[in-house]
Amino acid sequence: MKKTLLASSLAVGLGIVAGNAGHEAHASEADLNKASLAQMAQSNDQTLNQKPIEAGAYNYTFDYEGFTYHFESDGTHFAWNYHATGTNGADMSAQAPATNNVAPSAVQANQVQSQEVEAPQNAQTQQPQASTSNNSQVTATPTESKSSEGSSVNVNAHLKQIAQRESGGNIHAVNPTSGAAGKYQFLQSTWDSVAPAKYKGVSPANAPESVQDAAAVKLYNTGGAGHWVTA
């Protein structure tokens, strides 16, 4: 699953310089907060998609709690990915080429172009997956439901496509690796931020379809489709 982001201008102080200025090193040679970077990657923190982890060129690879993480930049483009240690495929990767040449202390205009996200291209290489893993299978309870007939919530066409890609429309789907659950594969922290009080702390997969639909609409209306890798 690949996610590409394009930025037309950079925020203050990013310090990105075109060319290969900077340094390259493995994580063992650098003072990196591995736990923090791993957590940001696992949760698809948008900070990683908006700017590099440091100025200049770098190339870091490290293992942490069963996963291998890679962060790199040539000073113009930056990217990151991670995958289960010992496997060849990356769970998630992101690239953000900077189109402007910027001095380290330069201040740019604060206009930022909307992120452009690649949709899955074909059935062979892009299967409906949970938000954070290409290598995980979504499982469901025996009472699964795969239609939206049980909901009266008005869900737009884009959200319906997201639901199909994330879970096949199954409201009881659960990703055993990431813990993402429900029709829209909510992470628990995201679900708790948009779910009604009655369902906070409850797995999204155990909530009625109408509640899941309403939460997804709320999340979509406030943050757009960027919450879903498959959007």
Swiss-Prot record:
Gene3D superfamilies: 1.10.530.10. Induction: Highest expression during the exponential phase. Expression is increased about 3-fold by inactivation of isaA. Up-regulated by the presence of NaCl in a IsaA independent manner. Seems to be negatively regulated by SarA. Negatively regulated by the two-component systems LytSR and SaeRS whereas is positively regulated by sigma-B factor, agr and the two-component system YycFG. Residues 119-137 have a biased composition (Low complexity). It is an enzyme of class 3 (hydrolase). The keyword Oxidoreductase does not apply. One of its GO terms (molecular function) is hydrolase activity, acting on glycosyl bonds. Its main location: secreted. It holds the Pfam family Transglycosylas. Keywords: Glycosidase, Hydrolase, Secreted, Signal. Residues 1-27 form the signal peptide. It is found in: Secreted. Residues 106-116, 138-153 have a biased composition (Polar residues). GO terms for cellular component: extracellular region. InterPro entries: Lysozyme-like_dom_sf, RPF. Residues 106-153 are annotated as: Disordered. Its EC number is 3.2.-.-. CDD domains: RPF. Belongs to the transglycosylase family. SceD subfamily. This is Probable transglycosylase SceD.
